[in-house]
Amino acid sequence: MAAEYEAGQASAAFEVRDPVLVRMASRPRGTALAGVDAADPVPGARRLAADPVLGQAVRVASGSLAHSLDRLTGDEGVAALGRKRTLSAARTLTRYARRAAARPTPFGLFAGVGRARFGSAAKAEPGAGEVAVRLDGAWLRRRVMAWLAEPSVRRRVDVVLNDLCFVRDGRLCLRTGGQERSVRDNALVGAVRERTRTLVGYGDLLDTLTRRFPSLDAERLDGQLAELVRRGFLLTSLTPHRIDTALLDGIEAVLDEALPDDARALRDIRAACARHERDSPGAGGESWHRLLDEVRRLDVSDTDGDAQARPPVHVDLHRRGEFVLPETVGREVCRYAGAIWSITPEWTTLAHMRDYRDRFIERYGTACAVPLGELADPHRGLGLPPEYGAEPTYARTGPGDEVDGPRRAFVGELIQEAVLSGGDLVLTDEVVRRLADVARHDPEAAPPRGLELCFQVLADSTAALDRGDFRLLGSPHIGAWAAGATAGRFAEAAGLTADLTRLATETSGDPDGDVIAAQVELLPREPRGLNIVQVPRLLPYRIPVGVPDDRDDPRCLDWRTLLVAAGSDGLRLLHPESGRPVRPVLPHMLALDAQAPPVARFLMDLATARPRVWSGWDWAGHDTLPYLPRVRYGRVVVMPKRWLPGRRLRDAARAKGAEVWEEGLDAWRRRLAVPDRLHIARNDQMYPVDLRDRWDRELLRSELTALHPQFVCYEDLTADGAGLGWNGGHSTEIVVPLAGARPSGGAAGTVDEERLRTAPPVRPAPTRFHCRARTGCSSSGTRSRRPTNPCSRITFPPCSARSRTTSTAGSSCGTRTPTRICGCASTATWRR
């Protein structure tokens, strides 16, 4: 009876929402591909490159590989490449060809996206592929910065001070890309700061400064302002962060007056993009070359070689067909999501935010709200979590690994049983109940408001789907904590904007309208990341971070003024004027630890970090084992079988001669019972190999001899198209948005939200008010000029801080690391 109750509770924790995104490989699995002979790779590489769809897909993906393939067409080009580069090109081309059939991850023309719905009868009609083209973010940013170097262009734009700037020790500082740059905060810079708090015309700013500083001529002032623009202290209305029709129209309007020839060239590029979109995939070779010619005619002359190797346009593939999945698939996804939620321990994900909250309470207490701009400054506040830097400055607090011992022991027992029996690790209802017991979490904790999960659908036919004869294979891209994030960048081209707006509103707000859901807008560290963040505005409120915006707009929330306060289970964000909770939303898949400004990452950590965060199956520290069994829950293959290469196999791969390598490979396969068919995987970048084939063994060897080999091997469950018949042999994934079921009636909800509905408005505190804990500390290696009150003049009723007795569980190289659902430590993003 208990097991049935647990299963029912798990199923009721989540509900399916629309839209369901389909990710589909462009080539059917099982299609015979031209083989390559390692002794003479040229003929095989030529046969692969002769495929029109693959050839065009490669040219869209990699300019450098396309150049190598062009050379392979003639003997002189082959001689110029040499054997080493020819082999490298053949390997890369083979990986691309395998990926086009085996991986549904959208990337150029290798895989496309569509939409699906749940219905009574399954249907799979992909329809013809359509190409969507836009200018590459890195190319456009480089070109815009070159235009802004022209005085005639600058005088026709608006500028605003970068909100990531701050003043310290008499200098205006800006942290971007892990580096800090600064200029002396003299009278001129101070006047610029004051005048550019909101958008102002560059020409008006220059005129104002000319009148205020008559001893400086206008040309010199213009040069000073141009340098502030070039170094990022001033953002302009042309600075690309949302590459849409409005931005391109605005650029054209400025260029029409300043540089008419460039304006005509930009219009020609846009027309060439439209012409290429009219061609079907594989048939647009001529329009593609014309498009490249138009773009490169306008390119910056001193572009480095790495930038030239990347195509200057970004291409996506969309499927306008119809996909219908039976309701049983949606119910299976909900059951699985609820089961994993029930066994998720506390603070195994985003554990650094637990420590940060403890430090926050120690310094500010529980009845104090602090402006985020002050809190993030390590000289006035706590600074951002030390994990955002190279090395944590503070030791981990918390109970330690011994608390997780029972869970680790039980998972180890399950692994041992599966390995000894040669079977799978099956998550029965009884196993789920026992895992929930050893997780030692609060069983009453509400599930997350929004979530999305990704699965590959395996069934022999649509009839098999209708009968319930299917499996759902968990994708390496597990999903995202924000429902709809995976579909975000395809919203406009795939016609999903209205659905994603509704989804973001449903999964980010609350029924009473107390919560302000605000879309975070940012500039990635690397300009090429602009291609990922191209999401239309889905929510009425927004939080710009390092991007130009109209800060006079009441729906534009300045992150520096938002208040941070301690809640019962984490930190929360409050609107300074109304005291309403603010929930940041990031509707795309940018890697925050590597690409986002640290403040933007912190905003999302504030929104997500709670004692329990849905984070997928966790091996409880056993993920360094050389072999891990398949994990199943119902019809969901949670994890396929997984093998780590190991030191002995790496040594054999690096040894001279083929004999040592072949012997080492055979020994590894015997020791760990490695099958013939595998997937070689780096996160969600995967391609299949058949270890019976000599060329495939060479592919594996080349992975092992890389400078830092970081990959794992998974069983290939779709070899020769197995389980893909329902969609014509194409590898197909679905990304299913889920909404967490909320407590009804008098059921206990989250303590903070219930209290906030009846709490008095946030109000100014008396000047004599002090926090319970005052520690006027500053960042390590720095000194504050004067002591500061660490508490903002804002108070509200204190919250209850629940004690915690759980520990963290780190990830390892053997874990299938998800794109956004992960608890990995930060890479260096804010160095102190």
Name each region found by the language model.
Residues 763-798:
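Short glycine-/aliphatic-rich beta-strand segments at the starts of folded cytosolic domains
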Residues 194-204, 208-216:
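Short capping segments at the starts of secondary-structure elements
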Residues 1-133, 218-528, 572, 680, ...:
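Type-3 copper protein
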Residues 827-831:
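Helix N-cap motif at beta-to-alpha junctions
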Residues 804-819:
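Short, glycine- and small/hydrophobic-rich beta-strand elements in well-ordered beta-sheets
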